[in-house]
């Protein structure tokens, strides 16, 4: 916190964090209801696994480009309007995607036009919704001092994790009424979240008080920050490669129908989210008081890598679910630890910028992970995406061991 942040009085600080937590949770719920249905929906539309990967790549490409822009903009005009705009953009893009998918299911659109419009909707969503994550992280940083930063990032991680717990299961239930129903639900939930943020969140950053804008928005990317950003990008690549192919993997290995797949995948991902949220909400807070982020990062890589290799060998429901639980534990340790390491490496005026850079790193992983994962699944083998992801995590562990990145407290600015 600094003089330029608009910190609520102590009596309202807890409420402000709770409202921000709920905002992130509801937004993530709206996104995660789609996880179980993307595979079955794509196959019903006549699209290949590789084409399905382009939906996430288009979305994340725009997030990669625009996340730093929105992060810096939140420094100049305030966090709240940028966050609300991102949530509205999320809603509009999902509504458009659902309408186009419905037209495709009815045979109204040619396959080429259908694919182009679906990818276009994802491009639009990536541009607008990329404002949400960096702004939410920066708002939480505004509300906490440096000593509590890791715990605060764990709270954000718990909000994401809880969204992942309830979202996939809810998506599986909603898919009983039609494969596009979860997409419409996400669009409506995005509008509700935007309204919640608009009416209840207080501004945490005084507009116009940011540090002078740098000519190069990547000027912060130096020293240990580069290492943390590389880990963010590649661990996300590994994770998203799994997420993008898991519905295909479950359907093909367990020999499920299109109707059965969303329910089974939803249950598995709900377990994944439950474990992740339990670690982020319960274990990260006490661990972060005793261990630095740079000590927790290798632990997360080891656990998540073990889960990926186990998943590549899994062939029945419970071994798949157990492997996903391991991946969830590793991800729950890595995510908030990386966010905390980055946040603690810059001064208070640079929180929005570094959050934007981290969102770009995450988006870079989300941009490449789906294409690699679906490409390996379609062209090499059903197990290849998870072996590849495990190898990436082992390589990152070697990088950490060699580079030994440390959080360096910056000079006040």
Where are these regions (language model features)?
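Central cavity-lining transmembrane alpha-helices of secondary-active solute carriers
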Residues: 54-71, 270-280
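Short amphipathic helix-loop junctions that connect adjacent transmembrane helices
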Residues: 36-51, 245-264
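C-terminal ends and interior cores of transmembrane alpha-helices
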Residues: 88-111, 302-315
């Amino acid at each position: 916190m600094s003089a330029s942040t608009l910190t609520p009085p102590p009596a309202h600080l807890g409420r402000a964090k709770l409202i921000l937590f709920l905002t992130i949770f509801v937004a993530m719920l709206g996104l995660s209801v789609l996880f179980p249905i993307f595979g079955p929906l794509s196959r019903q539309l006549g699209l290949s696994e590789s084409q399905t990967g382009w939906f996430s790549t288009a979305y994340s490409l725009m997030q990669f480009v625009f996340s730093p822009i929105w992060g810096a903009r939140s420094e100049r005009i305030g966090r709240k309007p940028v966050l609300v705009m991102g949530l509205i953009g999320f809603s509009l893009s999902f509504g458009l995607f659902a309408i186009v998918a419905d037209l495709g299911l009815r045979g109204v659109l040619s396959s080429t036009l259908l694919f182009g419009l679906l990818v276009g909707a994802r491009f639009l969503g990536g541009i607008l919704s990329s404002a949400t994550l960096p702004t939410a992280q920066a708002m939480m940083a505004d509300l906490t001092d440096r000593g509590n930063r890791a715990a605060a990032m764990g709270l954000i991680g718990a909000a994401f994790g809880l969204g992942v717990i309830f979202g996939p299961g809810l998506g599986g239930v909603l898919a009983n009424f039609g494969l596009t129903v979860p997409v419409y639900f996400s669009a409506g939930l995005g509008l509700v979240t935007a309204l919640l943020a608009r009416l209840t969140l207080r501004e945490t950053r005084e507009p116009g008080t940011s540090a002078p804008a740098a000519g190069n928005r990547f000027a912060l990317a130096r020293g240990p920050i580069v290492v943390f950003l590389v880990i963010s990008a590649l661990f996300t690549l590994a994770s998203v490669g799994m997420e993008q192919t898991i519905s295909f993997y479950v359907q093909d290995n367990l020999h499920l129908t299109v109707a059965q797949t969303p329910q089974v995948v939803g249950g598995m991902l709900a377990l994944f989210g439950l474990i992740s949220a339990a670690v982020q909400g319960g274990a990260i807070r006490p661990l972060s008081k005793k261990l630095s982020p740079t000590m927790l990062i290798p632990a997360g890589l080891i656990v998540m890598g073990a889960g990926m290799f186990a998943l590549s060998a899994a062939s029945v429901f419970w071994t798949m679910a157990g492997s996903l639980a391991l991946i969830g534990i590793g991800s729950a340790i890595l995510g908030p630890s990386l966010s905390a390491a980055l946040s603690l490496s810059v001064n208070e005026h640079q929180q929005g910028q570094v959050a934007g850079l981290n969102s770009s790193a995450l988006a870079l992983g989300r941009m490449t992970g789906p294409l690699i994962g679906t490409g390996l699944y379609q062209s090499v083998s059903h197990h290849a995406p998870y072996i590849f992801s495990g190898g990436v995590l082992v390589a990152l562990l070697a990088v950490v061991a060699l580079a030994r990145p440390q959080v360096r407290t910056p000079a006040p600015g």
